[in-house]
Amino acid sequence: MQVSIWMLVITVLAAVAAYFAGSRVNKKDSGLIVKQSEELAAKMIDDARREAETITKEADLKARAEIIEAKAGHDREITEKKKDLQILEKRLQQKEENLDKKFGLIEQKELDMLKKEQSFVAREQNLAAKSEELSRASDVQQAKLEEISGMSASEAKKELMTSMEDEAKHDAAKRIKAIEEEARETADKKAKEIISLAVQRYAGEYVAEKTVSVVPLPSDEMKGRIIGREGRNIRALEAATGIDLIIDDTPEAVILSGFNPVRREVARMSLEKLIGDGRIHPGRIEEVVAKATEEVDLGIKEAGERAAFDLGVHGIHPEIIKLIGRLKYRTSYTQNIYQHSLEVAFICGIMAAELGINVKQAKRAGLLHDLGKAVDHEVEGSHAVIGADLARKYGESAKIVHAIMAHHEDEKPNSVLAVLVQAADALSGARPGARREMMETYVKRLDDLERIATSFGGVTNSFAIQAGREIRVMVSSDHVTDEQSLIMARDIAKKIEAEMTYPGQIKVNVIRETRAVEYAR
């Protein structure tokens, strides 16, 4: 196809060349030119033919090379596929061999199982025969035993069960006692560690109890101005504050007496302002008392907020904050209740951290545990019950309310938090120096404790120990049984509660001792 095209092109070129040549030269030279053109055309045709042959050969060689290469690639692909097929065949062959082995093992196991089953059946039959034989022998032996012992089988079984039961109870009692002693020793040791750590890490201040306040005067002449004409000033001051003013021979001093420390503080501040101002008359007294009351209320609120801030306790109702501040002016057995509440809160927090419970909740319960003492002279009832009612009223959680209620056994403590508050309260109130009483009052209280204990029948002796926080009552084992000793302890506790006034709680410990004496001769 390519050769034909080339020849056609050459022929056309030759014809064109001849045409132009014929039109430009003389006719004479036309023959020569034609001849030359023909020769040139023939030469070009030969060159074209040779070139076409060359091209054809090259194309043929190229086509053959491509065919050879394609065939080689196809052969390689076939070879790879054959290899893959051989690998698959080997795998299949291995799987078949494995399956054959497994089938052989299964068949062997089935045969073994069949043999074992046959063996078990034979053994079962043998055991059944032996069991029947033993049963007959047992019946014979039982009949002989019943004949010899004079007891039936059920009676003998009952006797054996009773004996075993008594022995088991005895062993169990010994084991329980050992476990209880071990647990008690461990618990006591851990409790002492926690309590000692809590006490060591906190040392609070305390303020001695006072029912009077002393206001210094610049001179004794001021006493007359305080009394006023016909005593009108002193009457106005007492009426406005509810506090008694005692003006006696004490030089340059006026004594304010009253059981309510808040009102006493208002009276003290008012009197100091009046003395400093110099204007003392009923109208001015009422004005100054009103202003002093506002200042005391503000100081109470600030004291409550400071306590909550120092402990890191937040979200307390404003009314409870005020009640906490009022505890600053409340004391119990010479111990300031505000400082006591802070101390209990810190001790609760330390012990809670040691036990791994909520520290903030423990501090909150400790701070609020004596909340009722802020108003116990205004509301009837135990300060623990009053405090729990106030906490419940102002949105404290049930756990906090229960801890307040239970810290003096008005409610049985049923949570770790309640027990912590109870322990911290006892630690704060009972530590040396926290509370003070007159020596006569102290001795009288101990005498009263022992007198109440010895008033019961069967008591041989009694001892008031632990600074009056425990009474040990020794009773005669001939006149008082174990059950009666429990009742006696409860009766003594009730009589102490009815006849005595005391801080914290008193442990009544009734001890009954039985001695067995025998002589070896």
From Swiss-Prot:
Enzyme Commission code(s) on record: 3.1.-.-
Note the topology in the membrane. Answer: Single-pass membrane protein
Alphabetized, the UniProt keywords read: Cell membrane, Endonuclease, Hydrolase, Membrane, Nuclease, RNA-binding, Transmembrane, Transmembrane helix
Q: Which family does it belong to?
A: Belongs to the RNase Y family.
Record carries keyword Cell membrane:
yes
**Entry annotated with the keyword Repressor:** no
Which GO CC annotations does the UniProt entry carry?
Answer: plasma membrane
The top EC class is hydrolase
Give the HD domain ranges.
337-430
Q: To which species is this protein native?
A: Pelobacter propionicus (strain DSM 2379 / NBRC 103807 / OttBd1)
**One of the GO biological process terms:** mRNA catabolic process
The record's annotation in PROSITE patterns points to: HD, KH_TYPE_1
**Compartments, record wording:** Cell membrane
Gene for this chain: rny
Q: What is the lineage of its organism?
A: Bacteria, Pseudomonadati, Thermodesulfobacteriota, Desulfuromonadia, Desulfuromonadales
GO molecular function terms listed in the Swiss-Prot or TrEMBL record: RNA binding; RNA endonuclease activity
Cite the KH domain residue spans from the record. 211-271
Membrane-crossing ranges are 3-23
What domain of life is recorded for the organism? Bacteria
Q: Which CDD domains match?
A: HDc (cd00077), KH-I_RNaseY (cd22431)
InterPro entries (UniProt xref): HD/PDEase_dom, HD_domain, HDIG_dom, KH_dom, KH_dom_type_1, KH_dom_type_1_sf, Ribonuclease_Y, RNase_Y_N
Query: What is this protein's function per UniProt?
Result: Endoribonuclease that initiates mRNA decay.
Q: What is this protein called?
A: Ribonuclease Y
